[in-house]
Amino acid sequence: MTLRTRLAVGLLVLAVAPAASAQTADEVIEKSITALGGRAAHAKMKSRMTTGTIVVSTPAGDINGTIEVLNAAPNKARTLIKADLSALGAGALVVDQRFDGSSGYVLDSLQGDRDMPASQVDGLKNSSFPHPFLNYKDLGTSAKVTGKEKVGDRDAFVVLFDPTSGPEVRQFIDAETYLPIKMVMKVDVPQLGQEIEQTTEFLDFKDVDGIKIPFRLKASSSVQNLTITVSKVEHNVTVDESLFAKPK
């Protein structure tokens, strides 16, 4: 082998080495599942009740309220938010968002009751319980690592989830801890007649029954910022199926 050939081979090895060491989406996601507690621990979870407080920032000042989220396998969800808007001249606010696995409905004391928009329904169908990372392939969703970005001072893998229907989701997975620390997706806002991009940060992870749960979430968009602080998480609670359905 001539010196020129050896040099060319050496440069080729250097060129391909970074690509060979790059992690695939499957590897990153599986490490994230492990960091969150593992598949076996998640398999034990059939339902979850999360309670806490919510603060919504508005031009007129912060709105403080309570939030309850009930989840049940495989993808049922109910979110109940209550807040006092008397300081804004609007009285009590109650938003009861229900999804029974195939359709969704919102009971809203401020803006009126309504069916969920199709894009939101699709998003909830893709958000399987106890975690969407566990079976996204079974739902026909593809995933790929699109690079690395900073989330605050943390390096994070950016994994793009592309479902067969519904909005794409970008998950930012900490490159050291492998915990999912940020999510970006577009949400349909019928009141505005358009979609907006919403960023959600997952903070303050704590162990509950062998699973890592974020106890603080910060959501931001061009129209609204909110913070949810979790006070209690209960697994395998008794579920009233009627809470997921549209009231008759």
Regions found by a protein language model. Name each.
Residues 122-158, 180-184:
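Short, conserved active-site entrance elements at the starts or edges of catalytic domains
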Residues 152-247:
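Gly/Pro-enriched, hydrophobic low-complexity segments
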Residues 1-10:
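Bacterial N-terminal signal peptides that target proteins for export
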Residues 22-23:
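Boundary of Sec targeting at the N-terminus
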Residues 105-131:
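Acidic/charged, solvent-exposed loop-and-adjacent secondary-structure segments enriched in E/D, K/R, S/T
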Residues 17-19:
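N-terminal signal peptide c-region/cleavage motif recognized by signal peptidases
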